[in-house]
């Protein structure tokens, strides 16, 4: 009887977001390749026409102040002003409530370090590619912040919530929020290439961060 119950538990499918270390590094490499590709399109001025076409497709000529204000409120959920304080709260929660000081510190440092990396990249673009007027916003700071923060949460959820239905609801809700904020950014005038570049940087940061943590500490 006990043997049968053990088999039933062991044959249960693992949650999609409960990824092994090698898969996390592989995904990080894929997102890195996508970022390099997008950077190449921006650098050689191939992305401008694509950005304009996507913006014109998603935004009509007439501006709606109420819509703009609503979209700015949505975008605020991915801004540094919202993400950084929230990451500190998550870090405190992981350190005290979950009694995992290393993970709490690691979570906060991951968000802060990639925020610093973004500022360095934007500084590089501003001084090196001034002749590309649309590259000033590449990559999008908000897109990177929201993808990194919510991506880390998505990867951590399966480790803390046992019920798979709740795991899926939370994980896909956060994915939907990432896409919603990205669409809001494009409608407000941020170029598609900048948003996509921020997505790729944030996603590779989340994958590499959790992958390195699991490599060092073996478990969460």
Predicted regions and their residues:
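Hydrophobic alpha-helical transmembrane segments of polytopic
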Residues: 83, 87-90, 111, 170-177
